[in-house]
């Protein structure tokens, strides 16, 4: 689906309110395989260098074409739902295996949902729900 209307809008990075940016970075990086983009200290009004001892209160993380902003105790309520797409059921199964090995909080393993999509649900430390979705497998020989 292409919704380009010439407005210039090209991306969306949800801001997740978290209790601790440092703990959330560790969860997303170690359990879910995200990468850390940048960190910011509001108290010091500056970007932080990697592995600096100062605790961040804002960060950007990403994996693939998905990016989230993590904001400590601000910018919205905890516990929102995010829908992440992958192209194939095999990619979803691979993420499930990886995240299970890394002790991610899998709420629902992959299954076909009543609406026909192959999905799983994973929850982070602040009750944000990641619904990861793929189209269902097709029968062999189907076009």
Name the predicted role of every residue range.
Residues 6-8, 15-66:
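Core segments of cupin and vicinal oxygen chelate
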Residues 9-13, 77-81:
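Short, solvent-exposed beta-strand edge segments and adjacent coil->beta transition regions
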Residues 18-22, 63, 82-129:
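Vicinal oxygen chelate
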Residues 37-39, 109, 132:
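Residue-level detector of high-confidence beta-strand sites
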Residues 48, 137-143:
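A short, polar/charged loop-to-alpha-helix boundary motif
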Residues 56-58, 79, 117:
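Short hydrophobic/aromatic beta-strand or adjacent loop that forms the aromatic wall/cage
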Residues 68-71, 121, 130-131:
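Conserved beta-strand in the GNAT
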Residues 75-76, 114-115, 135-139:
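A short acidic/small-residue loop/turn micro-motif
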